[in-house]
């Protein structure tokens, strides 16, 4: 602990200094061989990092990561295991989707999750095809099924300001908005690509990162495309490839 304390203090002081100057920090999940979660400054200099499990334990990608209000970091160490760690890398919470709440023996992988204001954790279980909410002890508090017909191949998911939940499904390439209380579909948009990310904007439109479509699209509630960038970014030499948000 004598070794760790100066390091932790340095990280905290660094983060505080950046916060005081209103400079942006970036939380990074680097995977597919990198296997690291890190906090960097706007220049890319690493202020803090944590090595993760990596392919040797069946995990090849960090598809979601969050810094929590308490300063801890919530990430997934394998396709099925979520962990919350402190800046001194102590695991303070862990949940294994593969062996919990009826999933044993089933194929399940996780690409999206979030800590809720009530302290529970919402997890989207791809393949199993459901969204669950578990408490700090891993007890199932709420769940609803994803829409049948291919939407169980879920990727990124995010809550809206209305409290509904946007879930992206690579196949059949659709963004679906659910009422989290009963799992009813309240809106969807078929983009016909391996769509990866979507978020609801303040104006009520939905920004969609099309994944394999190499594009970013803004659509209205009436499902009309109001803005789009595809392929090459106008006025630059930047070519869009696999897109997420």
Cite the ranges covered by each PLM segment.
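Generic early N-terminus positional signal peaking at residue ~5-7
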Residues: 5-6, 151
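Bacterial N-terminal signal peptides
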Residues: 6-16
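Histidine-/acidic-rich catalytic cores in large beta-rich domains
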Residues: 21-245
